[in-house]
């Protein structure tokens, strides 16, 4: 039974590795591979909180912090204020902001080709896009096919070319 507080001690839970062409996509892949059944950085249990509550929650260094950061951005708290409290580098906060802004765009129902392409580049799954836009997952898959937006997979050579990567 591991404590939720994060620190320098190794934990037996919550460790993932994700590789992608952008940080945003890798972060979302990592989120999806956690055994928490979370599909989005925007969790209603945090996005519905007041700014004062979020500012207080940002002080907690635990496994919910990423969701609290995303909810804070969603609710209009400045990256500078979040940085002052968390000391998270602005580079990372900007990347999280990119994800939050895209999800806000999707929640307006926007789903033109450029928006869908950018959402996929940022690592959004068809399921999350469909839920945010308010359509079926099949509709999103049909749009991807129509607009030739297809997933790609790359092989990662974990043996430094000692053996042929397959």
Model-derived regions, located:
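ATP-dependent carboxylate/acyl-activation modules
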Residues: 1-166
């Amino acid at each position: 039974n591991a404590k939720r507080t994060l620190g320098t001690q190794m934990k037996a839970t919550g460790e993932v590795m994700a590789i992608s062409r952008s940080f945003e996509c890798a972060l979302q892949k990592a989120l999806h591979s956690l055994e928490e059944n979370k599909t989005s950085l925007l969790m209603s249990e945090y996005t519905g909180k007041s700014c004062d509550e979020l500012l207080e929650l940002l002080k907690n260094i635990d496994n919910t912090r990423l969701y609290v950061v995303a909810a804070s951005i969603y609710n209009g708290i400045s990256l500078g204020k979040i940085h002052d409290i968390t000391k998270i580098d602005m580079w990372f906060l900007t990347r999280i902001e990119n994800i939050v802004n895209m999800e806000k765009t999707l929640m307006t129902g926007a789903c033109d080709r450029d928006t869908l392409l950018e959402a996929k580049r940022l690592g959004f799954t068809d399921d999350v896009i469909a839920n945010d836009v308010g359509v079926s997952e099949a509709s999103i898959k049909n749009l991807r096919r129509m607009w030739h937006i297809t997933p790609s997979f790359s092989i990662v050579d974990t043996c430094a070319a000692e053996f042929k990567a397959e």
